[in-house]
Amino acid sequence: MKLYYHYDQEADVLYFSQGKPSAKDQSEEAKNDTILRIDPKTGKVNGFTILNFARRLQRGMTSVSLPIEAHLTQGL
């Protein structure tokens, strides 16, 4: 499955998805201005949104801790 990301500079938001985002996904607010996108059928996290992304970098934050566990595999 492909990984997609998009940064909206005007809104200062980073969007990250495993596969194409779906309108059926449910959003759940996590901590630190992070929103998780969850598949309602499987309960698995399909992506996340990080608010105030550039501001974090300007404040010297070089990493963002996400409240999810990821298992990535390489497709052939």
Feature-to-residue mapping (PLM):
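A short, polar/charged loop-to-alpha-helix boundary motif
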Residues: 55-66
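N-terminal intrinsically disordered, cationic/polar leader segments
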Residues: 16-21
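Short loop/turn microsegments at loop-to-beta-strand junctions
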Residues: 2, 32-35
